[in-house]
Amino acid sequence: MLHPATQQSPFMVDLHDQVHQGPVPLSYTVTTVTTQGFPLPASQHIPGCSAQQLPACSVMFSGQHYPLCCLPPPLIQACTMQQLPVPYHTYPHLISSDHYILHPPPPAPPPQPTHMAPLGQFVSLQTQHPRMPLQRLDNEMDLRGDQHPLGSFTYSTSATGPTLSPSVPLHYLPHDPLHQELSFGVPYSHMMPRRLSTQRYRLQQPLPPPPPPPPPSYYPSFLPYFLSMLPMSPTTVGPTISLDLDVDDVEMENYEALLNLAERLGDAKPRGLTKADIEQLPSYRFNPDSHQSEQTLCVVCFSDFEVRQLLRVLPCNHEFHAKCVDKWLKANRTCPICRADASEVPREAE
């Protein structure tokens, strides 16, 4: 029984599947396994490998690992296993429907001659791990020749298989599903419908309501001015209204504003004339023969003067019906025609 050395160097072995139509190169990954020995028949002799301890290696077909042989790096050229014929009908379950195919690396050196017996005479295959999709390697296999689909697998009609440079080490990849890709370059194809549905669900969500409008701004200079126009001061309103106002400053400001307004408006006068002021205005009976004014109608009622009608004369010498102009002067202090003050001339005459 062979015992592996303490220092193990991982490497890759190329297996070709023999079918009636030609050899079938399978996509596989060689990984190092736990230290163990493999019984070999006494009748089989491996040149250059019988006197040394060999590290263990394994072959993975479609996610399944199989122990194969023990070969140290110094004896790779003496004991090469690039082409090992395997009957196609012996392992039909290995040709699965996995869509994960390795991509080819740069070209390798020319093939070396085979120095070992067929695989079926001394290799015992056993399953170590459940099947899982192959993962992409940095050092990948070079598949050459005419490619023909066989079910969901791919085989070549060329007789010569690819070779592997002994100086390129291979590493065991952990089963990390984050780096799996399909053969046609679409990552996570089984997650795409769910991802699209999630985006559609996000698009269908209603938008949040708009924020409420801000409250109306407060103008502090308008309220004191409005309260100052009231007959009572803000301090006498009551305890329910508390205003942080400087009363002295507010009163001074309002007093100056009122003085400016009084200068522009002048002295305050009543709106109309009293009954006594109206009766002091001169009046007479209309006589067309003795009438000296050119005015023949009342502007208030737009009626012509008639005989024996009572007319009232304003200080501006405009004449009107007494009833019409008296009603007008109770609400206005000016003449309806020239807007002259009706109370100034009689007081000067007095």
From Swiss-Prot:
A zinc finger (RING-type) spans 298-339. One of its GO terms (biological process) is protein ubiquitination. Keywords: Metal-binding, Zinc, Zinc-finger. The keyword Zinc-finger applies. The keyword S-adenosyl-L-methionine does not apply. It comes from the Eukaryota. InterPro entries: Znf_RING (IPR001841), Znf_RING/FYVE/PHD (IPR013083). It holds the Pfam family zf-RING_2. One of its GO terms (molecular function) is zinc ion binding. This is RING finger protein 44. It comes from Rattus norvegicus (Rat).
